[in-house]
Amino acid sequence: MRIMLVNHFPLDGSGSGTYTKNIAVHLAMRGHQVCVVFPENEAPQEIPGVSMRYVRFSRYVPRKDALPFNFPCFTTHPRSVTTFGDLDGGELAQYLTAFDTAIMQAIDEFKPELIHAQHVWCLAWLSAQHGIPTVITTHGTDLMGCEKWPEFQGFAELAAKRCEKIIAVSGDNMRALHCRFPETVERTVLLHNGYNEDVF
């Protein structure tokens, strides 16, 4: 199967980044074709057998080949302290435009049969608009983001409405999701995070 993964953060330094990277690695090991769309402010480590599509951001000073600000987060990240609430209207428009372009280009070239987006948030909303079955994993910080920045609630609502399924990584996340978006109850799957048996 051709599966496109979309995340709001790089593939290291955050829970959802690590989650996305591990999913990509293991799907590729099982013979699936995988593409990942994500933000980056430095050269990413390649994953064998995985197509990497990233939107470039500026970490310290604006770069010509990148958006002139750092990638936004819900809290902080080892490589960014910018939050979604820090973005002004122009920066948010640049963010959405850059990711919409990257997602549409990946869809056109990679031709995914399924999209798995992380967080009930902006990029899940962008991903779910193209008529391709979309699954979203809620990690909890997205739901906290709706509380913290109500101006982003609309993106989350549309993402939740347009996706086929939502994966909750814990019972608490599932309850918070259903409280905020009651229409998702029938489409939610509880799937606890796994672990690497080779390590633990």
Which residues does each PLM region occupy?
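Short, well-ordered alpha-helical microsegments
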Residues: 122-126, 174
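Acidic anion/phosphate-binding donor-loop and adjacent secondary structure
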Residues: 32, 146-148, 178, 195-200
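Short His-centered aromatic/hydrophobic patch
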Residues: 96, 117-122
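Carbohydrate-associated surface elements
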Residues: 172, 194
